[in-house]
């Protein structure tokens, strides 16, 4: 028996507009869109046990999601960047847990949400310290929101304000042969949301 899971027709606009007030002040508007499809294993109706009380289950009804992004960017002195951004993702999917009603098991399955919405502001500041240290600092603040009205007899509308600090560094250890450089990068995020989850601090140094 065949059935149609989805049948839609959608525009995916992509555009970049730039206005140069003078070489010291540049304003740019970026609009982009895309479509993301689930993997084969995400839609395969197969049950994979994690332990005696948890399983991973495929979702044959999982739909691809569309993403629409917009950025308004101001570039000062062809060096410093200030931006405002917004990302809207209808039908966004993520792996979420729910309680099986027929047996004592947690089921982890990819589910389509109503939407994911993020918007915020950021600033990018590059700088140098002599010939030894070249760095770029990114600071941003945003509001994250994910919503699903029908989730196994439940619903959620999870939202959170978050901040992010990111720093990319290149240290020149030797300019003569051999030319040695060291890259040291790191970020810190105050938190995030994913479906019913309220995630704590995230960080990484590499």
Tell where the protein language model's regions lie, with residue ranges:
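Outer-membrane beta-barrel signature, preferentially recognizing the C-terminal barrel domain
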Residues: 6, 23, 35-84, 88-90, ...
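Residues on the lipid-exposed face of transmembrane beta-strands in outer-membrane beta-barrel proteins
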Residues: 15-19, 70-76, 121-127, 165-173, ...
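Signature of Gram-negative outer-membrane beta-barrel scaffolds
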Residues: 1-25
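Conserved C-terminal beta-signal and adjacent last beta-strands/turns
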Residues: 160-206
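Outer membrane beta-barrel strand-and-loop segments of large Gram-negative receptors
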Residues: 63, 82-143, 147-168
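Transmembrane beta-strands of outer-membrane beta-barrel pores
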Residues: 1-3, 31-37, 46-47, 78, ...
């Amino acid at each position: 028996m065949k059935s149609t899971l989805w049948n839609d027709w959608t525009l995916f606009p992509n555009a970049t507009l730039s206005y140069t007030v003078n070489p010291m002040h540049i304003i740019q508007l970026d609009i982009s869109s895309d479509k993301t499809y689930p993997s084969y294993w995400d839609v395969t109706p197969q049950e994979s046990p994690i332990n005696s009380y948890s399983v991973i289950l495929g979702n044959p009804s999982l739909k691809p999601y569309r993403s629409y992004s917009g950025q308004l960017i101001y570039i000062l002195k062809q060096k410093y960047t200030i931006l405002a951004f917004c990302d809207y993702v209808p039908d966004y999917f993520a792996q979420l847990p729910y309680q099986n009603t027929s047996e004592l098991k947690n089921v982890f399955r990819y589910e389509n949400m109503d939407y994911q919405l993020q918007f915020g502001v950021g600033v990018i500041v590059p700088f140098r310290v002599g010939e030894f240290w070249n760095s770029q600092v990114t600071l941003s603040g945003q509001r994250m929101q994910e919503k699903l009205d029908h989730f196994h007899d439940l619903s959620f509308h999870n939202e959170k304000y978050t901040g992010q600090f990111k720093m990319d560094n290149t240290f020149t250890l030797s300019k003569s042969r051999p030319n040695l450089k060291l890259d040291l990068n790191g970020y810190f995020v105050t938190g995030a949301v994913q479906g019913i989850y309220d995630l704590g601090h995230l960080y990484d140094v590499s």
